[in-house]
């Protein structure tokens, strides 16, 4: 599918979708629990549906009721799945469920779509093998399809922190119900650390204790997942909100604003988008008590931003940089190349097609907004929901029509993105 976006002025109120990261973790935590847990206000998207299906294949149940997800847990010992677990495009599902599958007393096979089958899982496979299980890639390259044999009983394991923080999350969540717990020692600096903070936040809400250590993280074994009141409410998603906030900062109508609701403080690192916009000179206000962020169109200036902990913000920041005066330098970005696509290369290519002056480096993306006049063009979302949404925001301020291929991939995290954008006044047929 293709979506077109034409130059537009936007205004009004919108609510960002619930957090994808929190929804994934809440669904699996509810799977680890005994009995029934209601996950309230979840994100229902292609990725989170993949996690719900995995919970069912591991012996639990996940039913939609009145906008919530009612999950019946499989407890501390998942069943051996009677089919291959298809994680579709969801790397979070594959990493978290691979560790869960290592608790089963038997063999589990996991796969995904073409994009997911190109993403790295080797450090997690090595860790599970070091904990007493057997975990391997069928192609011997650390990529799916994966075959996992359990059960693991716990222990200590070393793994790199600069490939994916999801490996740590997977081991913490599974480790709580092992006999002895799991301790991870990180051999390299942890990238995307706020995502582990999200995990610790969810574990705490489910009554599970885990902590950071001098060398990594530790979770005690023999714990039980038991959320207060047998329910858990998912907060709003700052990654998704970033596109709406960027739209307001770049394209709000004169005297008007874009107001994004449901944005209460949480452990999400991508709340940093508010600080980034402030540093660029945006007229933005966050009422943390009400969870409302208001942003008006402003003259922006380039800044330097490190994305070691916020890889999902790179596409948004790159678009802001293309429309700002001066140079925006996005650093600590090498790990962003291992997402649904190589987001550094993809944004460099797409913004260049739109007329931006962009320089791609191994660990950086440099956008020279002062040398840029954005013009509409046909660009490819590369099957990556975050590229599609960021490029749609660029289309609001490009001269002429911007056509984005692969617009259907917004279903991964923000299924009604184009409807929300149109509701704010954008000229789009997405």
From Swiss-Prot:
Please state the protein's primary subcellular location. Answer: cytoplasm
Decide whether keyword NADP is in the record.
Answer: no
Coiled coil: which residue ranges?
Answer: none
**Pathway participation:** Metabolic intermediate biosynthesis; chorismate biosynthesis
Please state what class of enzyme this protein is. transferase
Residues at which phosphoenolpyruvate binds: 20, 91, 119, 166, 343, 386
For this protein, the Enzyme Commission number is: 2.5.1.19
Please give the SUPFAM superfamilies that the UniProt record associates with this protein.
EPT/RTPC-like
Tell me which domain of life the UniProt entry assigns to the organism this sequence originates from. Answer: Archaea
Annotated active site residues, numbered on this chain, are: 312 (proton acceptor)
Write out the ranges of the annotated region (Disordered).
1-20
Give the location in the cell: Cytoplasm
Q: Which GO terms describe its biological process?
A: amino acid biosynthetic process; aromatic amino acid family biosynthetic process; chorismate biosynthetic process
User: In the UniProt record, which is one GO cellular component term?
Assistant: cytoplasm
Binding positions for 3-phosphoshikimate per the UniProt entry: 20-21, 25, 164-166, 192, 312, 339
Tell me the subunit arrangement. Answer: Monomer.
Name the family.
Belongs to the EPSP synthase family.
Q: What does this protein do?
A: Catalyzes the transfer of the enolpyruvyl moiety of phosphoenolpyruvate (PEP) to the 5-hydroxyl of shikimate-3-phosphate (S3P) to produce enolpyruvyl shikimate-3-phosphate and inorganic phosphate.
Which protein are we looking at? 3-phosphoshikimate 1-carboxyvinyltransferase
Organism field: Halobacterium salinarum (strain ATCC 29341 / DSM 671 / R1)
What is the taxonomic lineage of the source species?
Answer: Archaea, Methanobacteriati, Methanobacteriota, Stenosarchaea group, Halobacteria
List the gene name: aroA
């Amino acid at each position: 599918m293709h979506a077109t976006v034409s130059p537009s002025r936007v205004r009004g109120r919108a609510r960002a979708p619930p957090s994808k990261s929190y929804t994934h973790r809440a669904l699996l935590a509810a799977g680890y629990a005994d009995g029934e847990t209601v996950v309230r206000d979840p994100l229902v998207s292609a990725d989170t549906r993949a996690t719900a299906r995995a919970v069912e294949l591991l012996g639990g149940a996940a039913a939609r009721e009145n906008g919530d997800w009612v999950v019946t847990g499989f407890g501390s010992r998942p069943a051996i799945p009677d089919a291959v677990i298809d994680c579709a495009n969801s790397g979070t599902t594959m990493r978290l469920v691979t560790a869960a599958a290592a608790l089963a007393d038997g063999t589990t096979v996991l796969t995904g779509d073409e994009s997911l089958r190109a993403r790295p899982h080797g450090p997690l496979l090595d860790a599970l093998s070091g904990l007493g299980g057997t975990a391997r890639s069928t192609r011997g390259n650390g990529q799916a399809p994966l075959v996992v044999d359990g059960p693991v009983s716990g222990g200590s394991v070393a793994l790199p922190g600069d490939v994916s923080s999801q490996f740590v999350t997977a081991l913490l969540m599974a480790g709580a119900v092992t006999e002895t717990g799991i301790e991870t020692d990180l051999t390299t600096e942890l990238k995307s650390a706020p995502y582990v903070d999200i995990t610790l936040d969810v574990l705490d809400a489910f009554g599970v204790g885990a902590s950071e250590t001098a060398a990594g993280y530790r979770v005690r074994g023999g714990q039980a997942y038991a959320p207060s009141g047998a329910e858990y409410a998912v907060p709003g998603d700052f990654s998704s909100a970033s596109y709406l906030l960027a739209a307001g900062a770049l394209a709000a109508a004169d005297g008007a604003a874009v107001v994004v609701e449901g944005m209460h403080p949480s452990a999400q690192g991508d709340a940093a988008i508010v600080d980034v916009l402030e540093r660029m000179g945006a007229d933005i206000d966050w009422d943390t008590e009400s969870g409302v962020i208001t942003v008006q169109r402003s003259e922006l200036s380039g800044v330097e931003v490190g994305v070691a902990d916020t890889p999902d913000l790179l596409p948004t920041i790159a678009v802001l940089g293309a429309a700002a005066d001066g140079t925006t330098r996005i650093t600590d970005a090498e790990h962003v190349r291992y997402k649904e696509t190589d987001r550094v290369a993809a944004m460099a290519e797409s913004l260049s097609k739109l007329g931006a002056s962009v320089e791609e480096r191994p660990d950086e993306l440099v956008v020279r907004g002062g040398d840029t006049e954005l013009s509409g063009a046909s660009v490819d979302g590369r099957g990556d929901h975050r590229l599609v949404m960021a490029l749609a925001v660029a289309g609001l301020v490009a001269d002429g029509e911007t056509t984005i291929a692969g617009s259907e991939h917004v279903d991964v995290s923000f299924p009604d993105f184009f409807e929300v954008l149109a509701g704010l006044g954008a000229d789009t047929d997405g």
